[in-house]
Regions:
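Short, histidine-centered active-site or binding-site loop motifs used for metal coordination
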Residues: 7-9, 40-42, 139-140, 197, ...
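A generic secondary-structure signal for well-formed alpha-helical elements
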Residues: 61, 68, 96-100, 138, ...
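Short catalytic-loop micro-motif centered on adjacent basic/acidic residues
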Residues: 75-78, 142, 225
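Short helix-capping/linker segments at secondary-structure and domain boundaries
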Residues: 98-102, 135-142, 245-255, 283
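Conserved nucleotide- and phosphate/pyrophosphate-binding catalytic cores
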Residues: 149, 155-335
């Protein structure tokens, strides 16, 4: 089984990114052929600073490796180094409807936030995302709940292409974590945790100091009542139960049993302690890795070579199926 996912090199990684994506990436190394991409091209679809983007690619690579990605057990590369992605994106536009792209929630939300220019790249984002995955004929795409509609679109694109030009692509499945699919802001649990749209005190960053993490959980908003139980009217406590369940690798019901009869304050302190201890090794290892950009660049370049070897074969099949470029010559067999 081939597993593929991409991660944005924008902003500091928070607990939602870590539980919803990075933990899945690490586990994927034991489940199949894992291919992970730092999507710098996607990051250019909104306003950005070029020098900052380059630095954040290294930040992201370091945090992924610190979390447990092993370049010897997976392919880790920078999207912009594998040009097959962009050519495949263009070819896939022939089987993608404008209406589908206009309906994407991410396009509508981000286009409102753009002050000067809503780029065509922002509209085309899901097509490039489809190219990212389909180039490797991936079977599974680990994503958060907010990316479900993009995976559904890439599935539709793959099916449409196969029907029009012949069986070429694998139709991928999404893999959304059962626990922690949407980590909420600790101060405003009605919305998801976010580096850009969330509150500073409600956003736990992976590289936060342990004391800062504990402090944020102690100050987290709770709900009416006194029982450590999930419920639709208890978004704050539900969020923290699901966070601790993800940290422990257990079902939320197990957390509820462990804290039966305890006060909210004790529960919040316990969650803060466990999250801080869980992230501490990642923070320490990140510090060791981030100081050697040459080593990180070497890992990304080696990963790009491996990725290109796969994607180029897929692109050749796509071009042949679509009639783009010269016809393939038959294999020359020895007399």
């Amino acid at each position: 089984m081939i597993i593929f996912s991409g991660i944005q090199p924008t902003g500091r990684k928070h607990l939602g990114n870590y539980i919803g994506a990075i933990v899945q990436y690490v586990a994927g190394q034991d489940r199949g052929e894992a291919i992970y991409c730092i999507v710098d091209l996607h990051a250019t679809t909104v306003e950005y600073e070029p020098a900052v983007l380059r630095e954040r690619v290294y930040d992201t690579a370091a945090i992924l490796i610190a979390a447990g990605l092993d370049p010897q057990r997976c392919i880790l590369f920078r999207q912009g180094d594998v040009h097959e992605h962009t050519e495949l994106c263009w070819l896939l536009t022939s089987v993608t409807a404008i209406g589908e792209l206009n309906r994407m929630h991410q396009f509508r939300d981000k286009s409102v936030a753009q002050r000067q220019l809503v780029s065509a790249g922002l509209l085309m984002y899901p097509v490039l995302q489809a190219a990212d995955v389909l180039a490797y004929r991936a079977h599974e795409v680990p994503v958060g709940e907010d990316q479900r509609e993009h995976v559904e679109l890439m599935r539709a694109i793959a099916r449409r292409f196969n029907e029009r030009f012949g069986e070429t692509f694998v139709v991928p499945e999404h893999r959304i974590p059962v626990v922690g699919a949407r980590v909420r802001d600790l101060q405003e649990p009605e919305r998801k945790m976010s580096t850009t749209g969330g509150t500073e005190q409600g956003t736990v960053h992976v590289l936060d100091e342990p004391d800062a993490i504990r402090r944020k959980f102690k100050r987290a908003v709770t709900d009416s009542g006194a029982d450590v139980l999930r419920g639709p009217d208890k978004p704050g406590i539900t969020n923290m139960i699901e966070i601790l369940a993800a940290v422990r690798g257990v079902a939320p019901e197990a957390v509820e049993r462990d804290f039966d009869g305890l006060r909210y304050g004790d529960f919040k302190a316990a969650v803060g302690d466990e999250v801080a201890a869980w992230l501490a090794p990642v923070r320490e290892r990140y510090g060791e890795l981030r100081g050697d950009e040459a080593a990180l660049e070497g890992i990304l370049e080696a990963g790009a070579d491996k990725a290109r070897a796969i994607a180029s074969g897929t692109l050749a099949d796509v071009r042949a199926a679509m009639g783009v470029g010269p016809a393939r010559r038959p294999d020359l067999r020895p007399a």
